[in-house]
Amino acid sequence: MVKSMKTNNRKGGYSASTANEYIDSKQAIYCLSTELETQIKFEDGQPTGEIIAYKAWFTQKGLPPFQVKFPSEVALPNYMTMVEFDNLEACEVGYNVYFRATDIKEVKY
């Protein structure tokens, strides 16, 4: 069964416990992105050109693809490589779930 990535219960701010409600730590996570997407800072509705974060897409069995934001540029592994995150946290905003982590590592079998 595919779980929805819509919120279960809304709480404020990012937390590891919220991430654990959505991501199963016993299941493999795979990298879908082959390059990072940049997030640009906006002021007064206009882009400043300043990069404030990097994002990439991942998947886990039973979940829709999900995006994780990183505060600095990370080295993405190859497409469909099994990965794990450093300090994965999630935040529920409205009915959406947003993820962030400090780094990513390839899982060696």
Predicted regions mapped to residue ranges:
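OB-fold and OB-like single-stranded nucleic-acid-recognition modules
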Residues: 1-109
